[in-house]
Amino acid sequence: MASKRKHQASQKVKEESFKKHTLDSDEEDSDDYEREYLNDSDIEGGEEGVAKVEDDVKVTPFNMKEELEEGHFDKDGHYHWNKETEAKDNWLDNIDWVKIGTQKNAFDPAKDEENSSDEEKNEPVGKAFNLSMNLMKMVEFMKPGETVKMTLQRLGKQRPVLTTLQRIKQKKAGIVDPKTQEISQLTELANEILSKTGNMDIYQDTYESIKAKIADLPGTSKPKVADDIDMYADDFETKELERSKTSSSDSSKPTTTTSEVTWEFKWSQDETDIQGPFSTEKMLKWSQENYFKNGVYVRKCGENTNFYTSNRIDFDLYL
């Protein structure tokens, strides 16, 4: 009798568990789905028909069919992309993440300062920062009276208005809009000036102020080094004689002692590109106008000494 009762009890449990998975429960699940997601029929204002061309203009009916193919709307009207059709950047497929993780120089957040210093040391010498060159390139995108921020806004308005599906297709095809490319280039130039010189107001600088800076600051001016005379050349004696005559004539001229001091500087201690020479008045003016917000490394022209930070130099003493 006891075994019979146990059998009846287990049979009853099986029947109850079977009742939970019926057609009625499936209908309840579908009702929940309809409550969470909007169907095409729930969206009002949609137009039927197919796209057609009128007077060389493509006219498409106003509906959400293309959007519903790529995703769905929830009950609150928010759009969600289908995960299985999520757009991915093609270049990510070519990256060997396992190899990157095993590299010795992989980025370690705990060694942030060491990583940043290593990047500065490994930065190629040929990629020297040139302030005047950056400013001249920025002016090419700008118009008179515009600030850098206004130029970016103007270029942004000139970009074509595309649907989400059109943007995805262009991204997959590798098509880049010219105006988008100009915005990226101008932003990159402005950010480089901001990070190298500390000029936080670069996006508020006008077309005229940038032109004035270009006229005031030469691009790449290095102190000229006299060419060495090759003692094994055929014309060595002639060049040496001319050189001695020039030096003797210069020494015979009355010496006009000028106490004017000129300066040369570079943006960072590791920089190989030297700017200058500049007068003391100009260096003082730039310092008073807070042009060198983070300071630059300065030394007197003609002195083969180390560069020192401009924040510790009082240019008033040399006037």
UniProtKB/Swiss-Prot annotation:
The modification Phosphotyrosine is found at residue 37. Keywords: Developmental protein, Nucleus, Phosphoprotein. It is found in: Nucleus. One of its GO terms (biological process) is compound eye development. Residues 12-24, 109-124 have a biased composition (Basic and acidic residues). Transmembrane segments: none annotated. Pfam families: GYF. The modification Phosphoserine is found at residues 25, 30, 41. Residues 260-316 form the GYF domain. Residues 25-47 have a biased composition (Acidic residues). SUPFAM superfamilies: GYF domain. Disruption phenotype: Embryonic lethal. Embryonic wound healing defects. The few adult escapers show subtle rough eye phenotype and extra and/or misplaced or missing macrochaetae on the scutellum. One of its GO terms (cellular component) is U5 snRNP. InterPro entries: CD2BP2/Lin1, GYF, GYF-like_dom_sf. This is CD2 antigen cytoplasmic tail-binding protein 2 homolog. It comes from Drosophila melanogaster (Fruit fly).
